[in-house]
């Protein structure tokens, strides 16, 4: 569904530094994930990292965002690459926590945050529900509403890698979700 209504809001700035970590990533060694739609994109499951960056993600998700369950993906979109129009299916997080939820309930359970890890540059874009997120800066935090309902897409037709952090989670525990939906 596309309504051309702004369904996102800038809600803050990531409270820890990312540049030193991102610069060290050897994207050629990063494997494709099981739920990745576009083969050229590279994704790191940040919540699984056993280092200071992973600990910062864990603290941010649990303390600052008050998420009881979550996934956090660092994705690199190379030049010349597009993310086709889609809605979120929440395959990884529902599988990870063994959640059985009807698609119609996803937006009542899950929250999505989109956080660019590099400033917007020529050729980079992200469109959500037909509305562009404009002049983003590295570490801006955008909350996206209804990501299983509203279509979104993005791309990189520029010269530099486009790198983002996406956090999907719930402020309900897995047990509470099981109680509600079983």
Give the location of each predicted region.
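Catalytic core of non-heme Fe(II) oxygenases with the double-stranded beta-helix
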Residues: 65-145
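Small/flexible residues
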Residues: 39, 47, 114, 145, ...
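Residues at beta-strand starts and edge strands
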Residues: 2, 8, 109-111, 161-163
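Catalytic core of Fe(II)/2-oxoglutarate
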Residues: 119-182
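General structural signal for secondary-structure boundaries
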Residues: 11-15, 94, 118, 170-174
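Non-heme Fe(II)/2-oxoglutarate
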Residues: 1-75, 82
């Amino acid at each position: 569904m596309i309504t051309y209504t702004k369904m996102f809001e800038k809600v803050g700035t990531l409270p820890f530094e990312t540049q030193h970590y991102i610069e060290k990533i050897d994207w050629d060694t990063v494997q494709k994930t099981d739920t990745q739609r576009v083969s050229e994109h590279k994704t790191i499951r940040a919540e699984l990292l056993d280092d200071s960056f992973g600990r910062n993600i864990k603290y941010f998700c649990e303390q600052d965002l008050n998420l009881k369950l979550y996934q956090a993906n660092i994705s690199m979109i190379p030049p010349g690459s597009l993310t086709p129009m889609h809605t979120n299916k929440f395959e990884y997080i529902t599988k990870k926590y063994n959640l059985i939820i009807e698609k119609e309930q996803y937006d009542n359970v899950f929250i999505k945050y989109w956080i660019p890890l590099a400033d917007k540059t020529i050729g980079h874009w992200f469109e959500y529900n037909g509305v562009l997120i404009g002049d983003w800066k590295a570490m801006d935090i955008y909350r996206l509403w209804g990501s299983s309902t509203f279509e979104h897409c993005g791309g990189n037709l520029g010269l530099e890698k486009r790198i983002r952090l996406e956090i999907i989670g719930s402020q309900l525990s897995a047990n509470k979700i099981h109680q509600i939906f079983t």
